[in-house]
């Protein structure tokens, strides 16, 4: 199966994927969001996950993602367990929804932050991979401001993702988001013209 109308959108934390997705949505493009699906799956499978990580991650029968994150981002084995549990479920859900969107014969986007980490085009047979790029120093600066995390926490989270420069080398198209919102809009427009 090849998803000929699907374009994978990826990037690291703090590169501007969310802003780019808002621009694409405002232009009428359909987006399949791996993170939203992951959040739904975390809730659906919260009891299984709590068996692994302890009932402290549940509050009134709702999984507290911050508490779970505090555990998994400090322990590579626990993060691997969670990813091994979730990623096949996310993929199944994404591909099912993508097959429906293929029927429209129009370009759409799969927002998969960990696209390369989970197997890239072997796991998600898309037509193109677009990277939203910002250099690592800018990622850190944005995360310090946006998420109010300590630099050590940011570095820990960045270490869990493939280096942004590696992703850049593996992508089919780069949207450089190291400047202004106005420039990002121009770059998105330039990319969209390649779809015509």
Swiss-Prot record:
Pathway(s) annotated for this protein in UniProt: Cofactor biosynthesis; coenzyme A biosynthesis; CoA from (R)-pantothenate: step 5/5
Recorded catalytic activity of this chain's protein: 3'-dephospho-CoA + ATP = ADP + CoA + H(+)
Top EC category: transferase
Keywords of this entry: ATP-binding, Coenzyme A biosynthesis, Cytoplasm, Kinase, Nucleotide-binding, Transferase
Binding positions (ATP): 14-19
Cellular component aspect of the GO annotation: cytoplasm
Protein name: Dephospho-CoA kinase
Organism the protein comes from: Helicobacter pylori (strain J99 / ATCC 700824)
